[in-house]
């Protein structure tokens, strides 16, 4: 991220366009997020973007903000200041985002799925990577270690397998549950072998997405 972009973000207060469906930054079909110099401009814009609102104005911390937007799956930040419109392209240099396991593709598809309900974003999840919580029993008399996949039980005692898009989401759940699990990277094909016919919850402590057997089979369906 160059000095021009740093100044653009840090020298003014901005409000961010928020999706009412996710309570997170709104991501459009071109994978842009939007920030505004004035509430007047923001309120005019939301008339053209359904189910959106705006955050309070704040001075953004450029590195943190860009990292966060990268993790959500944004490819550009559109900065609107009156009649002027600037675009900051994401991803930026690795040093700016401190890429860990942000998984922007999966987050992007989930945000767009929640915002639009369009099943193409559901099918896109087939190519994405997730974190699955596991416990590993150390070998004793057995030749191989045993892997146990953590599950959640909701009402009616039904079993749900768990997936997370980021280490932050995984750690939040792991600490809340006191599970002391480890994260295992899986894709939807591997997860289908793990879950058998049970449903899956993605990111249960934030904007959770529940996928039943029908939706999971739709994800894996060949084109």
Question: Could you describe each region identified by the protein language model?
Answer:
Residues 1-223:
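An interfacial alpha-helical scaffold signature
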């Amino acid at each position: 991220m160059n000095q021009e972009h740093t100044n653009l973000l840090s020298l003014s207060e901005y409000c961010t366009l928020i999706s009412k469906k996710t309570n997170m930054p709104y991501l459009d079909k071109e994978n842009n997020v939007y920030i505004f110099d004035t509430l007047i401009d923001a309120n005019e814009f939301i008339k053209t973007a359904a189910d959106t609102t705006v955050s309070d104005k704040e001075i953004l911390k450029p590195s943190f903000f860009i990292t966060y937007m990268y993790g959500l799956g944004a490819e550009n930040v559109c900065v609107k200041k009156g009649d002027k419109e600037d675009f900051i392209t994401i991803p930026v240099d690795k040093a700016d985002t401190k890429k860990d396991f942000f998984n922007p593709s999966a987050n992007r598809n989930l945000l767009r799925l929640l915002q639009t309900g369009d099943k193409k974003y559901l099918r896109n999840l087939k190519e994405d990577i997730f974190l699955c919580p596991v416990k590993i029993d150390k070998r004793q008399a057995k030749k191989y270690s045993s892997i146990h996949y953590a599950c959640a039980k909701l009402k009616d005692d039904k079993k749900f397998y768990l997936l997370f898009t980021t280490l932050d989401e995984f750690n939040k759940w792991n600490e809340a549950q006191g599970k002391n699990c480890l994260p295992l990277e899986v894709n939807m094909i591997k997860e289908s072998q793990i879950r058998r016919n049970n449903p899956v919850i993605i990111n249960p402590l934030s904007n959770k997405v529940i996928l039943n057997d029908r939706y999971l089979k739709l994800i894996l369906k060949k084109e």
